[in-house]
Amino acid sequence: MFADKLRPFLDRYNEISALLGDPNIINDIEKMTKLSKEQSSIEPIKNAASQYLQTLDDIEENKALLDDAELGELAREELKSAQIRKEELENEIKILLLPKDPNDDKNIFLEIRAGTGGDEAALFVGDLFNAYIRYADLRGYKFEIVSQSEGSAGGFKEIILLIKGKGAYSRLKFEGGTHRVQRVPETESQGRVHTSAVTVAIMPEVEDSEIEINPNDLRIDVMRSSGHGGQSVNTTDSAVRITHIPTGLVVTNQDGKSQHKNKEAAMKVLKARLYEMQEAERIAKETSERKSQVGTGDRSGRIRTYNFPQNRISDHRINLTLYRLDAIMAGGLFDEIIEPLIAHHQAEAITDAGL
């Protein structure tokens, strides 16, 4: 019975409450801190579980009144409401019981790179960049450009952002993959629709303690910074390129005002990429028997199509199609794509966990 799975959480919460009132514990700051953190982590489950158990009682009480001449009709209405509430609470609790992604609350590096399609791909990188920063702004996140390479006709060949805010990774982690765009270029006189593609990578910002890099595995090159079109923008060798020799990963940064700043920014991106690579390998092992693009954040496959003539956006992982592309690209309705992706992932995780 589902209720039986909840009682250990209620018992543990009450046990911790009693321990936190114990004078011996109060004088032990380390134990107090550990118990307080555990209690905080259990509290949402405890609150939902208490409501769930109360709802079960309400259901039984109303069932007992169904044949009552005076209260039967009211009991029938109350029973229906309680049964709906029971289902809602069950789903809420199942989500709370899922193992938390340790990266969910982290800041992210968001990398958008032009793929096939030349100038059109670079222009769409710019469009996606604008959509993401509008969404970040609406969510109250802060962002900064870590590095950028402008396209010859506008937009960007590549741009990397650091988006800061609690839950940034949890909201945007399913954006990684190939995004295909279909639209008529401004230079197209025949009105033909062109198809181009960009790739997006979402990488959690990592602490130094989370990933170790052997300095001997790095090759660091410094060079003259260059601006749009390749012209020199200063007289010092401030641009930095870092190569991680074992993996072949290369990160270049020249947007900072000093070599030190550029090296620091490049190292942060390199660590995020290496961490993402390690996480992808770990997840691939854990989910080898269950192929789920949403669950694994697979970057290799086409995840979404943006069709401008039809004002249509389609996410191929969950068979979702919306005809509000203009509003979604404006950032305000981005959650209409993100929320179903999160719900799909949670539903799969609940099934896998046997809840």
Curated annotation (Swiss-Prot):
Bias (Basic and acidic residues) ranges: 283-292
PTM remark: Methylated by PrmC. Methylation increases the termination efficiency of RF1.
GO CC annotations on file: cytoplasm
Main location class: cytoplasm
Family annotation (Pfam families): PCRF (PF03462), RF-1 (PF00472)
SUPFAM superfamilies per record: Release factor
Keywords: Cytoplasm, Methylation, Protein biosynthesis
Keyword Electron transport included in the entry's annotation: no
Organism: Campylobacter curvus (strain 525.92)
Function, as annotated: Peptide chain release factor 1 directs the termination of translation in response to the peptide chain termination codons UAG and UAA.
Region of interest called Disordered, as start-end residue ranges on this chain: 283-303
Sites bearing N5-methylglutamine, chain numbering: Q231
Parts forming coiled coils: none
A GO MF term: translation release factor activity, codon specific
InterPro entries: PCRF, Pep_chain_release_fac_I, Pep_chain_release_fac_I_sf, Prokaryotic/Mito_RF, RF-1
Subcellular location: Cytoplasm
Similarity comment: Belongs to the prokaryotic/mitochondrial release factor family.
Protein name according to UniProt: Peptide chain release factor 1
